[in-house]
A protein has these predicted regions:
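Glycine- and acidic-residue-biased ligand/ion/polar-headgroup-sensing regions
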Residues: 5-26, 45-53, 57-61, 65-94
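Long, contiguous interaction/recruitment modules in multidomain scaffold/adaptor proteins
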Residues: 72-77, 83-217
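Alpha-helical segment of the N-proximal tetratricopeptide repeat
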Residues: 205-246, 256, 260-263
């Protein structure tokens, strides 16, 4: 299973009135809005009668910041309570999901699951009318044949928590999910029951706090990401894509997850939408973040020049914000590619 990233994240839950944020390492303030990601060292400033809520990096505690003050995001949070989110770093790249002629696994893929009877989904193959589906593990061998592109695992034989399983799909055209370049990492395992209880308690705590709908979804997705329940994080956020959300963090989060689990055509779509919204809103930080994520997808799609162009564009955005750490990080990446 994945190795955690190094940075803890905070979430700006909502903003009532006028507020700004200043990122750590940057010299400029920018307008604050609900859904924004924050990190240790970031400052939040309220004006007039403004009020903001910040969800701490323990992923459940929330504190309220009142008007006419400036505070670091950690100010109202418990000490030493942060978790490291597992996706979204520049190096979180996984091959896979790039050949539309293959029935590559969509879900469950490089994830922990909580449901012992998961829905299995794969990419549709043109011309295919039947698919043979297998679930393979050290204690499970199961097979069925279906005409669609999804089927629910019946729970028999039962999955064992902590054991790696693999879904294999073969179309009647001969195309196989095993030909996907990311098939080796496209495994899943069942969450232990005691961990499931903890996740459910944390999700319930978020739901009790009255977050705006999309911010609540982002906060719940963070809890799932913490536990490697990436399929559930996706299932939490994708309905907002279907409804046409303009909250760019939804697309950014999905792009990060898809890139991490090796669904790179889907990652490309989500990052491109984040870029479009950030461009329209003139949000420099978000635009640079989405471009740097899309850049990594482009190299996995064997488009290295597109990656370099996007990294240079992202670097230009960070330069406008005087974010020296990200400027240097992207320059090192550019140097690796040229």
């Amino acid at each position: 299973m994945p190795t955690p990233a190094t940075a803890s994240e905070f979430l700006l839950v909502d903003v009532n009135g006028s507020a700004q944020i200043k990122r750590s390492g940057q010299s400029q303030y920018q307008s604050a809005r609900g859904g924004m990601r924050l990190n240790i060292g970031d400052l939040v400033r309220t004006e007039g009668g403004a009020q903001v809520r910040i969800r701490c990096s323990d992923l459940t505690t929330t504190w309220t910041m009142n008007s006419n003050i400036e505070r670091g995001v950690v100010w109202g949070c418990p000490p030493d309570g942060g978790f490291s989110l597992r996706v979204g770093r520049q190096s979180d790249n996984t091959l896979g999901g790039i050949d539309p002629t293959l029935p590559y696994i969509v879900t469950p893929r490089r994830t922990v699951i909580s449901d012992p009877q998961p829905m299995l989904r794969w990419n549709p193959v043109a011309g295919a009318s039947r698919y043979t589906v297998q679930v393979i593990g050290s204690d499970v061998t199961w097979e069925t044949e279906v005409s669609g592109t999804q089927v629910q695992y019946p729970g028999t034989p039962p999955l064992t928590p902590g054991v790696d399983y693999r879904v294999i799909v073969e179309a009647d055209t001969g195309a196989s999910s095993q030909l996907d370049v990311g098939s080796e990492t496209a495994t899943f395992e069942l969450l232990y029951p005691e961990d499931l209880d903890l996740v459910a308690a944390d999700v319930a705590q978020i739901r009790e706090q009255g977050f705006p709908e999309e911010t609540e979804a982002l906060a719940i997705a963070d809890i799932y990401i913490r536990e490697d329940l990436l399929a559930e994080a996706i299932a939490t956020l994708e309905p907002f894509v279907a409804s046409g959300t303009q909250t760019l963090e939804v697309y950014q989060a999905l792009g990060d997850i898809y890139r991490y689990i090796g669904l790179n055509l889907l990652a490309e779509e989500r990052y491109e939408r984040a870029i479009a919204i950030a461009t329209s809103n003139e949000e420099i930080q978000a635009l640079a973040d989405a471009r740097s994520g899309l850049a990594e997808v482009k190299v996995l799609l064997e488009q290295p020049q597109a990656e370099i162009d996007l990294l240079i564009q992202a670097q230009s955005g960070y330069e406008r914000l005087n974010d020296t750490e990200r400027i240097q990080e992207l320059q090192a990446r550019i140097d690796d590619l040229t």
